[in-house]
């Protein structure tokens, strides 16, 4: 929007009392809440039932407002399917899509049936691959997964990682940040941020903390592990939250680990800055936005060596890699950073510098290049192609 591009962001209305059109993203960008199914939060798999209604609502809004769009950029497979519906009405508008996560990858790491992606998601993702003119992937690993798991050989993919707001996520005086979020200023803070689901590996973190308490009891006397995500006070908390809370009791780490539920985005920078360590023990991450936000805050990350985390976190340079589902190795790495101040501070400084590469201004330029190439007139595309083709002779 800051480059003079008018942007309309469509989302499904979840509250009838929220204005249909919001200017909250700033000049040149609108958030438009359209009715598609009940105006309330729904389980993600139920949203699939209202994709057609969502697409129709977008089409009707554009017609009523007399708006024409040059390009559609969709995120997640459900929005990609909506774009497929719009393609029937707007056949000449190119579609750019970003999956963020892939159902078949989630299925490969699932350990229970309830973690599996539904069949309609797998079919939907395959369809979106066919629909899209360009597929944005966060890392080369995600590109390889599309080829390997979905048989995609279309060469539609372009690697453009997500960006981070370096003004919002930045190093802050740690004691002041701890005081702001209510962590004792002399405690060492370990932080997890994410959805409370088996895929995120919170159980591995709990097991690792129990090992540290057993082996190095003095090291955890002033340690606070904060779990951000979910709703631990819900009248009927979900199965994973119940399982993790029970595990905390069984492992005897109630005094160390605190579940504090979801937090407002504007509060997260203080939690990152307050933490000595951010832990991401995920079994699968297409990128790892939490890791990038932590790194921008100058906080080292210990992450599973999976998916995008294997690219984002550089082992021994700005954080540590550990194998997925390995509480022993995770415990040793956490302990190392708890007791080695110079190592922790070095990794934190390097993390902030590495995060600068992902500044939103840089990422926006890369995305604009993708848009410009798609919108280039056909004759210019052919001319550009001929200039860039190497002569095999």
Regions found by a protein language model. Name each.
Residues 329, 336, 343-357, 373:
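A short, well-ordered alpha-helix in the C-terminal region of glycosyltransferases
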Residues 300-303, 313:
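Short hydrophobic beta-strand element within catalytic cores of glycosyltransferases
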Residues 262, 270-275:
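Short alpha-helical donor nucleotide-sugar binding micro-motif in glycosyltransferases
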Residues 13-14, 18, 118, 126-156, ...:
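A short, active-site helix/loop in glycosyltransferases that binds the activated sugar's phosphate group
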Residues 2-69, 392:
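A conserved catalytic-core segment of Leloir-type glycosyltransferases
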Residues 315-316, 320-327, 336-341:
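Conserved acidic donor-binding segment of nucleotide-sugar-dependent glycosyltransferases
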Residues 283:
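Aromatic "clamp/platform" in nucleotide-sugar-dependent glycosyltransferases that forms part
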Residues 170-183:
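A short helix/loop element that forms part of the nucleotide-sugar donor recognition site in Leloir-type
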């Amino acid at each position: 929007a800051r480059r003079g591009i008018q942007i309309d962001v469509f989302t499904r209305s979840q509250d009838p009392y929220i204005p249909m059109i919001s200017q909250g993203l700033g000049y040149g960008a609108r958030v438009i809440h359209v009715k598609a199914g009940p105006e309330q939060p729904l389980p993600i798999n139920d949203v699939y039932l209202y994709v057609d209604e969502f697409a129709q609502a977008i089409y009707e809004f554009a017609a009523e407002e007399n708006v024409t769009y040059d390009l559609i950029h969709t995120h997640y497979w459900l929005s990609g399917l909506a774009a497929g519906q719009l393609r029937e009405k707007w056949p000449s508008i190119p579609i750019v899509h970003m999956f963020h996560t892939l159902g078949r990858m989630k299925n490969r790491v699932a350990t229970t049936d309830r973690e599996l992606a539904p069949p309609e998601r797998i079919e939907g993702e395959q369809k979106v691959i066919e629909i899209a003119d360009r597929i944005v992937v966060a890392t080369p690993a995600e590109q390889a997964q599309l080829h390997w798991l979905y048989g995609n050989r279309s060469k539609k993919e372009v690697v453009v990682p997500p960006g981070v707001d370096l003004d919002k996520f930045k190093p802050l005086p740690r004691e002041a940040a701890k005081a702001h979020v209510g962590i004792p200023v002399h405690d060492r803070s370990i932080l997890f941020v994410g959805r409370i689901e088996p895929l995120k590996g919170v159980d591995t973190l709990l097991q690792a903390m129990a090992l540290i308490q057993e082996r190095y009891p003095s090291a955890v006397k002033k340690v606070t592990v904060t779990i951000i995500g979910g709703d631990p006070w819900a009248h009927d908390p979900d199965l994973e939250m119940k399982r993790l809370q029970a595990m905390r009791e069984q492992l005897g780490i109630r005094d160390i680990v605190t579940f504090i539920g979801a937090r407002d985005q504007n509060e997260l920078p203080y939690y990152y800055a307050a933490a000595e360590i951010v832990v991401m023990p995920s079994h699968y991450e297409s990128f790892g936005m939490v890791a990038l936000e932590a790194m921008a805050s100058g906080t080292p990350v210990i992450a599973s060596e999976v998916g995008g985390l294997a690219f984002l976190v550089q082992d021994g340079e700005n954080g540590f890699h550990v194998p997925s589902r390995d509480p022993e190795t995770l415990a040793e790495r956490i302990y190392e950073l708890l007791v080695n101040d110079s190592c922790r501070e070095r990794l934190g400084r390097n993390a902030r510098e590495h995060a600068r590469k992902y500044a939103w201004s840089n990422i926006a330029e890369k995305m604009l290049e993708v848009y410009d190439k798609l919108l280039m007139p056909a004759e210019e595309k052919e001319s550009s192609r001929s200039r860039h083709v190497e002569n095999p002779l």
